[in-house]
């Protein structure tokens, strides 16, 4: 783990419920609830939220998503309410920084929430309370080399203290990818449209806990990147993501410190470097990469723990397909699932930058004018996230039918936040011809 405080998606809550974690796990891991991601200074149209909500359209209409964009166009770009407020019943509760449900018994099964948590403490708790009691043996050693068999599989890992034999090796060595990338020589596919490759990370204290311990993650755009704000119960995890193509490490640190102001630092700023991308083969021979060793996407949408969870589930699925018997098809299917997950999520993150109209620095001008977001090695996978066909914009007679009106996840919120509407004036005329009028549902202000 990078270990600077982690923000998770709502899908992580499903996993905690499945694991039946003890009630006190949040206290031990300094965890807080997360209902949304707030994007500040990413759009010239103001700040916007991406709240967690899987309850469908609040009016049970099949056109609620389209209705808001239709209303946006009909009001000449001045909608009476934001898209997030239009689609999310508990919008004002998020804004007021309150817990969404006051029935805590039913809240145990509530899924529209993620967490902010200390990833190091969380992993230590899992090892102590779940892994070791179930027979997992933890050896502390430094691996120096490996011994391969005639087929190229790793037969054993050679450590300073011992030699370790196994049928399968899971590479969790982080960005080093010591086994998958180092010993197996698996190459890396970059996501070239994601240019941020470094971050200064630090832990800070609170200056006003009542307002700063938010029930949502905050991402704030600066001149050369963006800052994350992940509030835990005792501290804040924060960091500045930037691209070294546009600013030096020293200048980025100075910009970050200026942003933090007089906030008390609880640790020294730590530089993190990475490559956005995915291993060409997440499963090679008898080695499987999980976590940072297999792939990484800059943390704008909290993909880190989600990909760890998904890859582990994909591996469990693969190993159960033929009673543990593994062949080329099983490995290929696993690799396809992992690469598809990472590619689609990478494009989802890229869409936050693709849709912005910020031009206040060389960094943002490059992002808006010089990056081809719609052309890469996964072109057939990159057009949608949350039922939103970005490659079919703007919607017209031919593409209108492809729009998934019932799926309000992902790109719908990002497009709305950037006022990137699928509805053109011409499309409005077309919709009027087929008797679709302005939204009839009463807007609540």
Q: At which residue positions do the language-model features occur?
A:
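Alpha-helix-centered segments that form part of catalytic cores
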Residues: 75-117
């Amino acid at each position: 783990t990078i270990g600077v405080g982690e923000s998770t998606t709502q899908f992580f809550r499903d996993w905690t419920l499945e694991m039946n974690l003890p009630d006190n796990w949040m206290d031990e891991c300094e965890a807080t609830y997360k209902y949304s991601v707030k994007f500040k200074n990413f759009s010239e149209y103001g700040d916007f939220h991406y709240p967690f909500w899987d309850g469908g359209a609040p009016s049970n209409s099949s056109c609620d998503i389209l209705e808001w964009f239709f209303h946006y166009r009909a009001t000449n770009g001045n909608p009476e309410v934001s898209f997030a407020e239009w689609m999310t019943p508990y919008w004002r509760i998020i804004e007021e920084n309150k817990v969404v449900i006051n029935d805590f018994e039913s809240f145990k099964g509530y899924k529209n929430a993620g967490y902010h948590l200390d990833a190091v403490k969380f992993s230590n708790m899992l090892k102590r309370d779940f892994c070791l009691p179930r027979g997992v043996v933890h050896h502390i050693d430094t691996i120096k080399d490996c011994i391969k068999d005639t087929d190229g599989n790793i037969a054993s890992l050679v450590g300073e203290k011992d030699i370790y034999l196994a049928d399968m090796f899971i590479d969790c060595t982080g960005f080093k990818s010591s086994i998958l990338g180092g010993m197996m020589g698996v190459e890396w596919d970059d996501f070239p449209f994601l240019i941020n490759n470094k971050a200064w990370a630090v832990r800070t204290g609170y200056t006003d806990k009542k307002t700063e311990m938010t029930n949502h993650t905050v991402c704030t755009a600066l001149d050369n990147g963006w800052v994350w704000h992940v509030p835990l119960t005792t501290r804040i995890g924060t960091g500045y993501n930037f691209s070294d193509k546009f600013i030096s490490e020293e200048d980025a640190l100075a910009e970050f410190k200026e942003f933090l102001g007089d906030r008390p630092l609880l640790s020294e700023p730590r530089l993190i470097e990475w490559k956005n991308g995915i291993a060409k083969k997440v499963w090679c021979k008898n080695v499987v990469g999980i976590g940072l060793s297999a792939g990484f996407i800059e943390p704008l949408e909290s993909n880190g723990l989600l990909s760890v969870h998904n890859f582990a589930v994909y591996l469990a699925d693969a190993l159960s397909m033929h009673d543990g018997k593994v062949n080329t098809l099983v490995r290929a299917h696993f690799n396809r699932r992992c690469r598809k997950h990472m590619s689609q999520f990478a494009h989802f993150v890229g869409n936050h930058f693709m849709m912005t109209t910020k031009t206040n620095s060389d960094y943002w001008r490059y992002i808006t004018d010089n990056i081809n977001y719609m052309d890469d090695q996964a072109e057939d996978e990159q057009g949608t996230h949350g039922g939103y066909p970005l490659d079919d914009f703007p919607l017209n007679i031919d593409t209108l039918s492809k729009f998934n009106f019932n799926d309000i996840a992902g790109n719908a919120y990002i497009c709305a936040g950037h006022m990137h509407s699928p509805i053109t004036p011409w499309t409005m005329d077309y919709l009027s011809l087929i008797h679709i009028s302005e939204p009839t549902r009463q807007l609540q202000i």
